[in-house]
């Protein structure tokens, strides 16, 4: 029997999807039998995060967490970070920012949650550097000595950007002047900024921008020469002629970066409350497998988007991505992501954000170190 589902803020779309021939509930339940000898079965479990396409089968009930009745609660990353690190910690399973989690562990001895190697959000970040078109900035090296705006400083996305700017182009954090905006034009999507995203290290020049201006307006008004931001600034999305991307063909730049480094930057991971894991040692594997099954279902959906989707070249894009990055281009598990994880941990320590350089094994629950994607 399929376990009961409750839905918070996310509508179920099972009916329309099932008519298109996607993998059925029966197929997934057969792969993950719900028979469980643990006396606590079925465990009431709340999972929080964003309703990404590759998570949606877990949300709408097509995929089950073995041994659990699962509630999915939609949340914004800043709010989820705050809840996990310094809030009521009611969530048993939550999406979190990878860098904030690492900083809480390294700097605050945080140990209430552990990570499992599921990564709901990952993005190449060359596309996330924006410039004022009139400042003569033509290449990354031109950012030396410039004023760069950011909303916050120590988020995962900004750590990645500073990392590849230093290692790929020789532009170190201390080579520029940082201006932190008092507002963020993308706050409605990201939520409140957690403490771990506002760490300011020693040895850099940093100041607060004009009161009442978000990062987008600072760039438009010329208060800064460039902008590092996880989201597209408002002025860019509105087509302001003076706001451009530093990398005009960011797709080609990011593809080349992956081919050379093998790094596909991770933004978010999944954390589980340790007291719950201690009481139910089988739970990390059940949660991991559910996320993995959901992702596999999305791969199947994507294989048919050339006919069912609206984008005219989706099929070609999907095939090209697989050719460059492999069939499982969004892998879960430690070993498939070790190089990427270690790069971020290195950047955080180099940039003076983390007080100590952490290993992968320190952040992820010991039982999950050998987990690999289901196929």
Feature map (PLM): residue ranges:
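C-terminal segment of N-terminal export signals and the immediately downstream linker at the start
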Residues: 1, 22-48
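Short, glycine-/small- and polar/acidic-enriched structural segments
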Residues: 38-40, 44-187
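A glycine-rich, aromatic-flanked flexible loop/lid motif
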Residues: 16, 257-268, 312-320
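Pocket-lining segment of extracytoplasmic ligand-binding domains
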Residues: 189-302
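N-terminal export signals
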Residues: 6-28
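Secondary-structure end/capping motifs
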Residues: 271, 276-350
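Long, low-complexity C-terminal extensions of enzymes
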Residues: 333-375
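Short helix-initiation/N-cap motifs at beta->coil->alpha
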Residues: 73-84, 176-217, 362-369
């Amino acid at each position: 029997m399929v376990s009961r589902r409750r839905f918070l803020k996310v509508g179920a779309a099972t009916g329309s999807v099932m008519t298109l021939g996607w993998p059925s509930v029966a197929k997934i339940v057969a792969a993950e039998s719900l028979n469980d000898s643990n006396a606590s079965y079925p465990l009431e479990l709340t999972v929080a995060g964003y309703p990404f396409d590759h998570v949606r089968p877990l949300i709408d009930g097509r995929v089950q967490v073995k041994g659990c009745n699962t509630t999915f609660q939609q949340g914004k990353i800043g709010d989820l970070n705050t809840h996990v690190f310094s809030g009521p910690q009611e969530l048993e399973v939550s999406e979190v920012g990878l860098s904030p989690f690492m900083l809480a562990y390294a700097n605050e001895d945080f140990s209430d949650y552990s990570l499992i190697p599921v990564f709901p959000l990952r993005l190449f970040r060359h596309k996330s550097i924006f410039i004022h078109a009139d400042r003569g900035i033509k290449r990354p090296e031109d950012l030396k000595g410039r004023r760069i705006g950011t909303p916050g400083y120590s988020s995962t996305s900004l750590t990645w950007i500073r990392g590849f700017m230093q290692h790929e182009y020789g532009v170190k954090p201390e080579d520029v002047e940082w201006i932190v905006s008092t507002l963020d034009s993308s706050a409605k999507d990201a939520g409140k900024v957690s403490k771990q995203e506002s760490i300011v290290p020693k040895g850099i020049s940093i100041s607060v921008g004009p009161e009442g201006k978000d990062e987008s307006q600072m760039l438009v008004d010329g208060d800064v020469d460039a902008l590092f931001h996880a989201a597209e600034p408002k002025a860019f999305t509105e087509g302001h002629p003076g706001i451009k991307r530093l990398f005009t063909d960011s797709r080609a730049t990011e593809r080349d970066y992956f081919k050379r480094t093998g790094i596909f930057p991770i933004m978010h991971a999944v954390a589980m409350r340790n007291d719950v894991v201690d009481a139910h040692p089988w739970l990390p594997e059940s949660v991991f497998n559910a996320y993995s099954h959901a992702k596999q279902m999305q791969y199947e959906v994507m294989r048919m988007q050339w006919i069912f989707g609206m984008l005219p070249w989706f099929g070609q894009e999907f095939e090209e991505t697989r050719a460059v990055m492999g069939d499982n281009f969004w892998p879960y598990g430690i070993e498939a992501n070790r190089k990427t994880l270690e790069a971020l941990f290195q950047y955080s320590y180099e940039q003076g954000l983390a007080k100590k350089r952490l290993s992968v094994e320190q952040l992820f629950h010991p039982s999950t170190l050998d987990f690999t994607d289901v196929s």
